[in-house]
Regions:
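Hydrophobic transmembrane alpha-helices and their membrane-interface boundaries in multi-pass
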Residues: 3-82, 92-95, 114-116
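Alpha-helix N-cap/helix-start motif
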Residues: 83-88, 109
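Hydrophobic core segments of transmembrane alpha-helices in multi-pass, intramembrane catalytic enzymes
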Residues: 87-95, 148-152
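Short, highly charged, low-complexity non-transmembrane loops/tails of multi-pass membrane proteins
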Residues: 167-171
Length: 171
């Protein structure tokens, strides 16, 4: 789990900072985005520092962390995707986190759910901008993004499984 905090959290922060700095959304969107990011960051740090204190609940805490990250990704995607197209990359964080300690079928379902949330938010965004159901090209783009999310998640799960096998073979 700490690996994700070292790589994915800074990536998410950089992605959001670039989205805000280079696209300059409204002040309300900017403040709300920073508020969500700050609250999620603080909660993730607190959970990671206290996971060993609640060792019996560590499995549940990790699952909550995955769903919390997905909710934060969805909120930030909704707020900033109109300004910064790469915001969809936030949907990689929850399935990648689940790949570290969940079974492959759970990772797959997490990735599918993440994709479903992304599709839903694309649709809601399309309705909000009066574009109806978006165009075929945009749905194809979203489909490509969804396929990447699933494949990347399964790749991460396979890598995590391989690391454990190598570790166990050295004992």
């Amino acid at each position: 789990m700490h690996i994700l905090n070292y790589y994915f959290t800074p990536f998410a922060v950089i992605l959001i900072l670039f989205a805000i700095f280079f696209s300059q959304p409204e002040k309300g969107v900017t403040y709300l985005s920073f508020g969500i990011l700050g609250a999620a960051f603080a909660l993730n740090i607190w959970l990671n520092r206290n996971i060993y204190r609640f060792l019996r609940w560590s499995r549940h805490i990790r699952a909550v962390t995955v769903w919390l990250n997905l909710a934060v990704s969805a909120a930030l995607f909704y707020l900033l995707s109109a300004y910064w197209a790469p915001m969809w990359l936030l949907f990689l964080t929850a399935p990648a986190a689940s790949a570290m300690y969940m079974k492959k079928w759970q990772v797959f379902l997490t990735a599918l759910f993440s994709c479903a949330v992304m599709f839903s938010l694309y649709y809601v965004r399309g309705l909000a901008f009066g574009e109806g159901g978006l165009g075929t090209q945009l749905w194809a783009m979203a489909g490509t993004q969804a396929v990447f999310i699933v494949f990347f998640s399964m790749f991460t799960a396979a890598m995590a499984e391989m690391v454990i096998k190598v570790r166990d073979s050295m004992r």
